[in-house]
Amino acid sequence: MYKFLDQLSPDHVEAIASLVFMEMLEAGYGAVAEFHYLHHDVGGRPYANLAEMSDRIIAAATKAGIGLTLLPVYYQFSGCDLRPLVSGQQRFGNDPERFLRLHADASKSVATGPKDYTIGLAPHSLRAVDTSGL
């Protein structure tokens, strides 16, 4: 999975999500809850717009015309023992402060979308987020 994700640009993510959302509509779904954890560039560096990838998911949902609950995933560690993220996980990782900024920026983007768009929080797991991060 990590090798595939290392190939994806924001344009790729938007194109893939647009296709998936269109196919969901054709299958009868009216909305999607997008468990979204790809936040940073291939090197794990944040984009200038922290919510770049979230904005691409929002754009894809808007193009397709599907309802959206955006669930940015908070991913902090590689294991329960607080191991640092491995190279393939760097695109997911945030510290608490940066994740809150990312979520705030994504919330502003969601607010400009259709009225049925909403945003939540998605801590990845007990392995990837410690109690202080919650």
Task: For each feature predicted by the language model, list its residue ranges.
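Metal-associated gating/positioning segment near the N- to mid-region
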Residues: 1-45, 51-52
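Metal-coordinating catalytic core of metallo-dependent amide/deamination hydrolases
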Residues: 40-134
